[in-house]
């Protein structure tokens, strides 16, 4: 029968010229007509005896395709019905042998699974119909798992060993491999058992970097534009290209990556929907990978010993997509997420060693032991998926963005090292060959690093994918507020803040134990990464022009969560984390490039939860960030306060309700507001002193180096190189301190104008006056020339603007008698002539001040001078004051003496209040101290009053004589 011969391409005729295989079998005599009864014999011969058939699986596929073609050709022919049974038999046997060939490797004479897979991958479209039939047959026969165990471990071997790189550079190969996965998992019975394939899971001992090579899904989950080889291919040829050219490469890779993610999601989604077991296995697989990769968020991660950025980021994106249905804007399924998820006995996520939001390990373990759920109470997929996504946001995508953040310094160091080696090469011919080899390695490393950075920036600039991530973060923010809400009804019912009464007392700024004891359960026991991951991502992504944060309709949810965390200090104990929150809010507060309001300002104004709580939250955190618990806490606080100052300034000028709130706080919550002003004063005092001192050092070193360059003899011991190092250090510190001081000074200006009373309380006013006088002397006094440096703007230093700001504060407080008195009492720095000099600079020399401004400043200086003279006369009246009447810290006569409980020292109430604003201990023995524990010394107060009265009467008596 010709049809059978044509389909199977075999003949019994030795003279046949069609090139078909000549059948050599005793079962079929030469010249016999090949009927249906011989099909099985013919196929067996071809597969098991024909030595010339070197591609048996390809042969079966070709037979199948030819059979389908013959069906179509003969469909309308007269003998179609008689041929139908023949074609059916060929299909049955070819598909059957296809199943056998893919299950028993040595069944065919030249059989080899790797050859079959190589053939399929190289031309997958021609195999899809045949493979579909094989899959269905295996399912019917109950041998589907055997089929899978032959195909996919071999496919893994192919990806690892039989292509140079399985990545986006090999477009045909990776697309065809994805097609194979898609084809198989489309069949639900396959998806149900797919996770049972040998090699789907890695051994527990598997190293983090081996998941991509040793697990079935590993290679396809690694397909990413941020893999090194892909980055070099796309970005490495021309690292100096234009921004437009770079953007075009970004867009091309983004489009390709989007398709890859869509296809990966299709595959994993089929597995998740396959069965309860396959769904659980997928979660377990992803969790195992995350648990092995905690070092990705270490300070110095050993990235070569961890899973790759592409692999971890892809899994993050997939999990984010799985979370979308239950975190959509309607929040109809938000109650499906188990708030007590971490109470489950068999968690996939490894929490050992995880820092908690506001509890120690021992307390957290005790809580979970006491409240552990029963073994049969397993969490639902939604809860597993949600918390695993948060885990990956921290260790997956979070590790990737951390990697990118470190690359800038890496590239800079490599470039410096290359220049250094080039100079050595130019001066040492004897080492030329060795140096050239080293230089080549370093330049290759630089090219790789720069290419990777471009690739990572392109990845994070991919707005559509990053929008999905930030949407998840907004949904997660809403859920976390719901967990904290005592009623657990948010967002359908507004949460009421604060959760516990505010701790206003000046000595309670660091009452960590109290806050921990009152933190809400179970939120306080959550791992810190549930907050840190979203915060790190949001802060990082905000620097991109395409950032998903900008003008995002769901941004309000995240700002609400941020406000809640700052407003309720008991929620999160880590001040660094809260520092990042205020940094992010400052980004959203700053005006945009077109000078329009910051992209969060509308939320600050119109979101009810935010508008009611943000101002208090910022003022409170400004105070309590004083102590961060780290070795760098002294400087950490300045960065956080700088961010807060940016927000406060924008709120004050742009949104009237915040200005009204601020004034209300100063009038009705005086202790709280004074605490804030005291911290501002501490910072400004230090920063101005630090900034101006370093500018003086810069001035001196610049002069020394200039003089040496002109041939003058050195006046300092340091060599030029050491001087350059010291100059760089002083310049950095001057720039940092002056920049931070400028923002604090701005707040002093605007607040002292509208709320002057807050700046003249007894515990504040003397320190404020001293600070202003000292810095006025620095700017216009005899040593002001030491502040002249080259390019002062580069240090964020504008002496004229600073002088104008300082004198503005004097004018703002000029009607306050307490302030006039405090300025006059500053014997160290107050001098009326300094004000005259300031007026000359601001008026005649620069024109920065109006005649009205100058008049007010001189009037204030005259009042202060008159007060100084009056104070001198009063001091003469009092003469020698008994030591017991003098404040032991300020050496002034006490007005309201109190006794400290531990040291039993007498001290003025205003002095100890000022001390407790920044230190909650007795200044004489460092024992803990609260203001309410001091005892008024009424007897001593009366003695002092009698002393003053007596001295005044004596003075009057002398004057009348």
UniProtKB/Swiss-Prot annotation:
Belongs to the ubiquitin conjugation factor E4 family. The U-box domain is required for the ubiquitin protein ligase activity. Gene3D superfamilies: Zinc/RING finger domain, C3HC4 (zinc finger). One of its GO terms (molecular function) is ubiquitin-ubiquitin ligase activity. Interacts with CDC48. Interacts with the ubiquitin-like domain of RAD23 and DSK2. Interacts with PEX29. This is E4 ubiquitin-protein ligase UFD2. Pathway: Protein modification; protein ubiquitination. It comes from Saccharomyces cerevisiae (strain ATCC 204508 / S288c) (Baker's yeast). Residues 880-954 form the U-box domain. PROSITE patterns: U_BOX.
